[in-house]
């Protein structure tokens, strides 16, 4: 999640996870107290998975976000949002015991909640930068018991001499 300012509302994030998706830390562990009490990290156990959401103070290195923002032909402002970001939130879901689909759904839910952060300007995932409200809306498919494939797979288009061509990004991980 790209941010225009190096700030987040950690409590809002935790509240939104609970209220929007019913996600709560199922095994509060005193051993993780240092990380969990950090202003820049949220660590939760959800089923057999661990959800980690971390605020990073700084620009994503090597213009990676800007380069990938060029892939979004549906949101011309993606490049400017990527160039202007001052910080970012990284979401990770760990847990080999859980099926990949369940890990993917948890990741998508957490990213959708990050879209509600005050300074959220772009969602950098799947080799592209999405507009936050667009990503959040697509994630709502999960509430209808549908897979959020448009959050997971970018369907790119490009023109060549023979006409319009298509490609996907992130399909290999599904």
What do these predicted ranges mean?
Residues 11-15, 19, 136, 140, ...:
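Polar/charged alpha-helical tracts
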Residues 1-4, 89-91:
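Short cationic amphipathic helices and targeting signals
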Residues 172-174:
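Conserved small/polar residues in nucleotide/adenosyl-binding loops
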Residues 6-79:
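N-terminal low-complexity, intrinsically disordered segments
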Residues 56-154:
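Internal, hydrophobic cores of structured domains that mediate oligomerization or house catalytic pockets
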Residues 93, 158-170:
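Long, hydrophobic alpha/beta structural blocks
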Residues 41-47, 129-136, 163-168:
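Noncatalytic linker/hinge segments flanking ATPase motor cores
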Residues 34-40, 124-130, 159-161:
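Low-complexity, flexible helical/coil segments
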């Amino acid at each position: 999640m790209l941010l225009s300012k190096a700030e987040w509302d950690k409590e809002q994030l935790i509240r939104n996870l609970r209220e929007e998706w019913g996600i709560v830390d199922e095994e509060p562990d005193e051993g993780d107290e240092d990380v969990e009490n950090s202003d820049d990290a949220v660590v939760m156990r959800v089923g057999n998975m661990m959800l980690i959401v971390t605020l990073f103070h700084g620009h994503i290195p090597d213009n990676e976000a800007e380069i990938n923002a060029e892939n979004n032909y549906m949101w011309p402002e993606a490049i400017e949002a990527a160039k202007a970001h001052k910080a970012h939130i990284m979401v990770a879901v760990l847990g080999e015991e859980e099926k990949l689909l369940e890990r993917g759904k948890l990741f998508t839910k957490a990213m959708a909640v990050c879209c509600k952060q005050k300074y959220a300007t772009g969602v950098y995932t799947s080799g592209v930068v999405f507009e936050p409200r667009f990503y959040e809306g697509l994630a709502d498919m999960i509430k209808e018991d549908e897979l959020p494939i448009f959050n997971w797979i970018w369907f790119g288009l490009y023109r060549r001499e023979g006409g319009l061509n298509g490609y996907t990004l992130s399909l290999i991980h599904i």
